Design a protein with these regions (language model features):
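Intrinsically disordered, low-complexity Pro/Gly/Ser/Thr-rich segments with frequent PxxP/GP/PP motifs
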Residues: 95-131, 135
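Composition- and surface-driven signal marking solvent-exposed, interaction-prone regions
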Residues: 65-67, 83-87, 99-103, 133-139, ...
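Intrinsic-disorder/low-complexity, polar/charged segments enriched in Ser/Thr/Lys/Arg/Asp/Glu/Gln
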Residues: 66-68, 116-120, 155-157
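Surface-exposed loops/turns
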Residues: 63, 113, 140-141
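Generic structural detector for well-ordered beta-strands
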Residues: 50, 55, 72, 105-112, ...
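Secreted, periplasmic, or luminal enzymes acting at the cell surface/secretory milieu
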Residues: 1-82, 88, 92, 145-149, ...
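Terminal connector regions
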Residues: 124-165
Length: 165
């Protein structure tokens, strides 16, 4: 957990001349957590969904191939509900700084209480591209992580590799 120091100042509620008190300021430094109250993609629901570990059809993605990701989502709550299943990606070895988790796909599903459903996503090399130094799309071979999760702060990372041509 990251912590940042924040300066907190207080001022009198009235001007010094109108309340008859000397003008003053109090300053204190406080430690506060540096995290969002709700992570990106977080949604509210009246039931609970369990995510299985994502299964890849291959550990490596060929330059002109596609990678299929499947995971089982189960409504383990007592009510019917809807869930937005999200696929996030991270490039571990890019030559430029890349997001820690980048949303690539999402799918909304409806499940009855106790019901399960397999959700499938497909990725291609074009989904791994970013703007290079010459401002043109580039995909660099290397290691990637992906997550299938209900928000950007959840899920279990599954590695795969983009092979060179």
């Amino acid at each position: 957990m990251r912590v940042r120091i924040v300066r907190v100042s207080s001022q009198p509620s009235c001007a010094a001349s109108s309340c008859g008190k000397p003008r003053f300021f109090q300053t204190r430094w406080r430690e506060v957590t540096h995290a969002a109250l709700y992570p990106f993609g977080h949604g509210l629901t009246y039931t609970r969904f369990d995510y299985g570990v994502p299964q890849l059809d291959a550990a490596q993605l060929g330059w002109d191939d596609t990678l299929t990701i499947r995971t089982r989502i189960t409504n383990s709550g007592a009510r019917d509900g809807e869930e937005v299943v999200q696929l996030y990606l991270r490039d571990r070895t890019a030559s430029r700084v890349r997001p820690v988790r980048e949303l690539k796909r999402f799918r909304k599903i409806a499940l009855a209480a106790g019901e399960s459903q397999d959700v499938e996503f497909t990725l291609a090399r074009a989904d791994l591209e970013f703007h290079g130094v010459d401002n043109r799309p580039v995909a660099e071979p290397g290691l990637f992580d992906l997550w299938v999760a209900p928000s950007s702060a959840a899920g279990e990372a599954v590695p795969f590799e983009l092979r060179a041509r």
